Amino acid sequence: SEVVHAGIYYPQGSLKARLCVHGKQLLYAYCAERAIAHRRCGKLIVAANEAQARELRAIEQRAVANGVTDLRWLTRDEARALEPALECQAALLSPSTGIVDSHGLMLTLLGDLEHAGGMLAVQSEVESLQVGVGASEGAIELEVNGAGEQTRLQARTVVNAAGLGAIALAHRT
């Protein structure tokens, strides 16, 4: 999505909330260090009426409980100073929400992986998976089918990026 999330909406103490709050700091630092295009552009969460303003206060409380420290409540006039065409009752500004060039980020992460001796197997289906086999104890052995070609891989660490199939793949061990 190319969005750097602040951790505003998730249930208090949830993994998503913790990862967003801590992860955004790490991501911004990594992007700056590696010259990956990104911007802390912020985000306005807008309440059009009094009922929505009450909901916005609940969102603010949840965010603060999750460790989001930079939210700012805006009056109608303060919000309009940022966005003159905006019609609202109130708004919540999240200045640490941002955007990142996901393509640049992925290429940089891939370079880091390869520099560390790792490899990426794209468009490959895991045919079999065994843990604790091979020369090194705890090794993971995979049989992978990529473009009709069977390959056997052995690794100490495997990142399961199977999307919606990730849980099913994890249960195959």
Predicted features along the sequence, with ranges:
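Short low-complexity, flexible loop/linker segments enriched in glycine and/or proline
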Residues: 1, 55, 87-88, 135-141
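Short intrinsically disordered, low-complexity coil segments enriched in acidic
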Residues: 1-4, 35, 140-141, 153-155, ...
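Dinucleotide-binding Rossmann-like beta1-alpha1 core, especially the glycine-rich loop
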Residues: 3-78, 82, 88
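Short linear functional motifs in flexible/disordered or boundary regions
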Residues: 16, 91, 170-171
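Amphipathic, soluble alpha-helical interaction motifs
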Residues: 30-33, 119, 172
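Short amphipathic alpha-helical segments
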Residues: 58, 170-173
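Helical element adjacent to the flavin cofactor pocket in flavoenzyme catalytic cores
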Residues: 92-157, 161-168
